[in-house]
From Swiss-Prot:
Subcellular location per the Swiss-Prot or TrEMBL entry: Cytoplasm
Function: Catalyzes the condensation of the acetyl group of acetyl-CoA with 3-methyl-2-oxobutanoate (2-ketoisovalerate) to form 3-carboxy-3-hydroxy-4-methylpentanoate (2-isopropylmalate).
Domain Pyruvate carboxyltransferase: 5-267
Functional pathway: Amino-acid biosynthesis; L-leucine biosynthesis; L-leucine from 3-methyl-2-oxobutanoate: step 1/4
UniProt-listed Enzyme Commission number(s): 2.3.3.13
GO biological process: L-leucine biosynthetic process
Major place of residence: cytoplasm
Keyword terms of this UniProt record: Amino-acid biosynthesis, Branched-chain amino acid biosynthesis, Cytoplasm, Leucine biosynthesis, Manganese, Metal-binding, Transferase
Protein's gene: leuA
Name used for this protein in its record: 2-isopropylmalate synthase
NCBIfam families on file: leuA_bact, PRK00915.1-1, PRK00915.1-3
Length: 522
């Protein structure tokens, strides 16, 4: 049996299902490219039949990614498989992942079929998917609660039909390690053709067992783990990619397996996913939390000064986190910024040095010292602003009356090349700024969540504002970054305005396309 564990990332499929607002195609592509740098073997990037947007994002990623295998999900239905195959056809190499429920409660209550009918559907789906690719994965949904006799029959039949990867999901996070390991061991003992496929696991974290169950499965012969960055996913989330990667690396002598993950990309990829998905990382999160390498106990600090491995089983450098947060000032030249970005793992293709340096100088003038985490935040915002925007905030002036609690905001905005200046009052400076922006853009949206977080340390830290807004019954996520909270809030709103503007253009395009089809058919 191979000692190589395949890392199957499903951040852009299962992970995205947990988000309040869908990611744009550009944002999904950013994450996909980061996952490729991270070294994931397979990335599941969407469910093409579910929506035109998902189809487009899968196709865009499939066309771009070269070093990881791109995968799309489909139910055990021919129309789903057709959509997946069509979206993936532009890829150099791809996988179709088809699934059906196998537990008694799912078969009877959800599918309302007999197990024999479900078995027949599974076999038919695998055979149909094999028409498009040799790389077909089949999942037994809710395998953790499936009677073991039925599970063995399903796995044997799917392999015989042509599946080269068999996925055993603990869909509702119900099992414990000894139980889940026993399921994997039983499959190896009882399925006669199991050597013709790779056994995969996909564990959810409802009882906090996803990582432990996945590691136990590897000890019993599984050689693919399905996971997400930061463990994001439905309900309590999925198995965390960064935890799996570092467990297998740190305990290699015990577990005897390895992955192809470039661990030095973990920190950067984790931050990108957190920012784009608007899902902050808890400070005590294993591997990537802010406190993961922090030692506050005096005894621990003394030990660390004498020998780092007294209290560190891995180093921050091993995940790409540099201990030396070198401070930079407005006197630092472009070469310093370029060097620091290279030290953090960013190539010049990942950012615009001139634009980043201009933003750096602006920030350095405001706060004096600029640190690595500031640069990363600026690079992230510079990448977000790289698209052509219909609305561009040029100036924001706010005045507050502390006695009456009323604020006045004046904004100057470039609206499609026309400069508009508007003023408005509100219940506080942020409300006033939002009202002024709404006037200038003549675009009304409903904000359903507002979140403020600090990016950096001290009183001059950058403030990041994340908002979720509803426009035409669709959720949009905007982000703004500035040393001033009101400015960050305004930038987040303008970001959302631009997203809704693009959504309108897409809707108009689709409407015209349908009209042209109707005219052509007359």
């Amino acid at each position: 049996m191979s000692n190589r564990v395949i890392i199957f990332d499903t951040t852009l499929r299962d992970g995205e299902q947990a988000l309040a607002a869908s990611l744009s195609v550009k944002e999904k592509l950013q994450i996909a490219m980061a996952l490729e740098r991270l070294g994931v073997d397979v990335m599941e990037v969407g469910f093409p039949v579910s929506s035109p947007g998902d189809f487009e994002s899968v196709q865009t990623i499939a066309r771009t990614i070269k070093n990881s295998r791109v995968c799309a999900l489909s139910r055990a239905l021919e129309k789903d498989i057709d959509a997946a195959a069509q979206a993936l056809s532009v890829a150099e190499q791809f996988r179709i992942h088809t699934f059906i429920s196998t537990s008694t409660i799912h078969v009877e209550s959800k599918l309302k079929r007999s197990f024999e009918q479900v078995l027949e559907m599974a076999v038919g789906a695998v055979k149909y998917a094999r028409r498009f690719t040799d790389d077909v994965e089949f999942s037994c949904e809710d395998a953790g609660r499936t009677p073991i006799d039925n599970l063995c029959r399903m796995v044997e039949a799917a392999i015989h039909a042509g599946a080269r990867t068999i996925n055993i999901p603990d869909t509702v996070g119900y099992t414990v390690p000894s139980e889940f390991g026993g399921i994997i061991q039983t499959l190896f003992n009882r399925v006669p053709n199991i050597d013709q496929a790779i056994i995969s696991v996909h564990c959810h974290d409802d009882l906090g067992m996803s990582v432990a169950n996945s590691i136990t499965a590897v000890q019993h012969g599984a050689r693919q783990i399905e996971c997400t960055m930061n463990g994001i996913g439905e309900r309590a989330g999925n198995c965390s990619l960064e935890e799996i990667a570092m467990i297998l690396a740190t305990r290699k002598n015990l577990l005897g397996v390895e992955t192809g993950i470039n661990a030095k990309e973990i920190h950067r990829t984790s931050n990108l996913v957190s920012q784009l998905c608007n899902m902050p990382i808890q400070s005590n999160k294993a591997i990537v939390g802010a406190n993961a390498f922090t030692h506050s106990s005096g005894i621990h600090q003394d030990g660390m000064l004498k020998a780092q491995n007294t209290y560190e089983i891995m180093t921050p450098e091993s995940i790409g986190l540099n201990r030396n947060n070198l401070n930079m000032t407005s006197r630092s030249g472009r070469h310093v910024i370029k060097h620091r970005m290279e030290e953090m793992g960013y190539s010049e293709q990942n950012y615009n040095l001139d634009a980043l340096y201009e933003q750096f100088l602006h920030l350095a003038d405001k706060k004096g010292q600029v640190f690595d985490y500031d640069l990363e935040a600026l690079a992230f915002m510079e990448a977000q602003a790289a698209e052509d925007n219909f609305y561009q905030l040029q100036q924001l002036v706010v005045q507050s009356d502390s006695t009456e609690g009323v604020a006045t905001a004046t904004v100057r905005i470039d609206v499609g090349g026309e400069i508009k200046t508007e003023a408005a009052t509100g219940n506080g400076p942020v409300d006033a700024a939002y009202n002024a922006i709404a006037r200038a853009t003549d675009r009304r949206i409903d904000i359903i969540s507002y979140k403020l977080s600090a990016k950096g340390e001290g009183q001059n830290a950058l403030g990041q504002v994340d908002i979720t807004a509803v426009y035409h019954e669709q959720n949009f996520h905007g982000v703004g970054l500035a040393t001033d909270v009101v400015e960050a809030s305004a930038r987040a709103l303008v970001h959302v305005m631009n997203l809704t503007c693009r959504a309108d253009k897409v809707a108009d395009y689709k409407q015209n396309m349908h009209k042209n089809r109707e005219l052509g058919g007359v």
